[in-house]
Swiss-Prot record:
Note: Antimicrobial activity is not affected by salt concentration.
TM segment ranges: none
Record key words, sorted: Antibiotic, Antimicrobial, Fungicide
The protein's assembly and partners: Heterodimer of a large and a small subunit.
Lineage: Eukaryota, Viridiplantae, Streptophyta, Embryophyta, Tracheophyta
Organism expressing this protein natively: Malva parviflora (Little mallow)
Job of this protein: Possesses antifungal activity against F.graminearum.
Any one biological process term the GO annotation gives: defense response to fungus
Protein name: Antifungal protein 1 small subunit
Length: 16
């Protein structure tokens, strides 16, 4: 992937 924005922020915490 090109970044953490491809997967929804479900416990990932990368969407902050």
């Amino acid at each position: 992937p090109a970044g953490p924005f491809r997967i929804p922020p479900r416990x990932r915490x990368e969407f902050q």
